[in-house]
Amino acid sequence: MSKVIKKRVETSPRPTASSDSLQTCAGVIEYAKSISKSNAKCIEYVTLNASQYANCSSISIKLTDSLSSQMTSTFIMLEGETKLYKNKSKQDRSDGYFLKIKVTAASPMLYQLLEAVYGNIKHKERIPNSLHSLLVETITEKTFKDESIFINKLNGAMVEYVSTGELSILRSIEGELESLSKRERQLAKAIITPVVFYRSGTETKITFALKKLIIDREVVANVIGLSGDSERVSMTENVEEDLARNLGLVDIDDEYDEDSDKEKPIFNV
């Protein structure tokens, strides 16, 4: 086991928001803006369309002409403290795992998507009739929970293991779920795509599907050393072998039961 010591590790202050402010339309938009490193215009407009499910509206994004001409996708990139959990109550279903991302940075696509969706609802345009009764002032917004985005649509996603100076390893996430769920929380990047706008009474949220997870191949733990300084300690002896044998992983019962949450979960759409 190797270790690299970095003394007095300092990170830039992370934007924070109160739970109450993240549950308002204006608050969630402002928070998404605060974690965006750019304000470049990406989205021309968004249309919400009725779907076969009464509580769900499909999301259609029209990018700016300059981005459309470059065949740019509508995927959204996030970065943050990431952890894959087993969902105790749903092991027999396809959503037996879900990803929790405590977002520290996001593409401007995220705040512009939220801004466009709630702008549509406010002005009663580009939305299905089922949403006309909604008032942005009374909505309880649930896209973020504890400054995190939860994603349980993982089917078809890829995971890319990266390491400085070495070729990355790209794999289907289906075969990596068990080993990833045993890792500690790690800084990672995620590429996601919006799926539906979900409404339950006055509670609303945008749900996402994972397209790609980009994560360090090496499992590293931050510990406080004997001198009181922060140390980054590698928990893997050989990264290549560990990927195959699932060594260097935290062997704990790190499962999360959505049904134990006192709040009504609406991120399972």
Curated annotation (Swiss-Prot):
Annotated TM spans: none
Top-level taxon of origin: Viruses
Name used for this protein in its record: Protein OPG079
Keyword annotations: DNA condensation, DNA-binding, Early protein, Host cytoplasm
Further remark: This protein is synthesized in the early as well as at the intermediate time of infection.
GO biological process: chromosome condensation
Molecular function terms, GO-annotated: single-stranded DNA binding
Subunit structure: Homoomultimer (Potential). Interacts with the small subunit of ribonucleotide reductase. Interacts with host FAM111A; this interaction protomtes OPG079 degradation through autophagy.
Entry-linked InterPro entries: Poxvirus_I3_ssDNA-bd (IPR006754)
Annotated function: Plays an essential role in viral DNA replication. Binds to ssDNA with high affinity and localizes to cytoplasmic factories where nascent viral genomes accumulate. May disrupt loops, hairpins and other secondary structures present on ssDNA to reduce and eliminate pausing of viral DNA polymerase at specific sites during elongation.
First-listed, main subcellular location of the protein, grouped into a coarse class: host cell
GO cellular component, one term: host cell cytoplasm
Pfam families xrefs: Pox_I3
Compartments reported by the entry: Host cytoplasm
Induction remarks: Expressed in the early phase of the viral replicative cycle.
Organism whose genome encodes this protein: Variola virus (isolate Human/India/Ind3/1967)
